[in-house]
Structure formats: structure tokens, C-alpha cells
């Protein structure tokens, strides 16, 4: 391991940052009490980020659109780790 390798975020850090960003975006769009069910699953393997979101929430705003925004927020947060 070189000194440069230690500067890279770990897989656990990447997963945590992505998950926090996705959940944060969802909870910025809905009150926590309005969300009936939410599952954010994040995996980072072999340099690939995989974010899956299940969201059961009121129709306004559209849960599908909010879930997509949450995926994008997770991806952006991870991109910032590598800058």
C-alpha cells in the first residue's frame, strides 16, 4: 500500500456517504412521519456504486421522482469524495 492509497475513501466510507445523502434528500422532501416505508441499499464493489431505493410515501411530491433524485444525490456525494 502506498501513501496515495490511504488517501482514497474506503468502501465503507463510500457506502455511508451515499446512504446518508440519499436518506437526507428523501427526508428533505417529506416529513419523517409521512414516510410509511423507506429502504436505501448501497453497495460499492470493484469501483461500481449501486444504489437501490424503495420509498413508500405520499404522492406529492412523486415518490419515484424523489427516489431518483436521492440516487443522484448519493452519486454526487460519492463523486465529491474523490475530488
UniProtKB/Swiss-Prot annotation:
Domain of life: Archaea
Pfam families, A to Z: DUF3194
Classification via Gene3D superfamilies: MTH677-like (3.30.300.100)
InterPro entries tied to this protein: DUF3194, MTH677-like_sf
Family of the protein in this entry: Belongs to the UPF0440 family.
Protein name: Uncharacterized protein NP_0614A
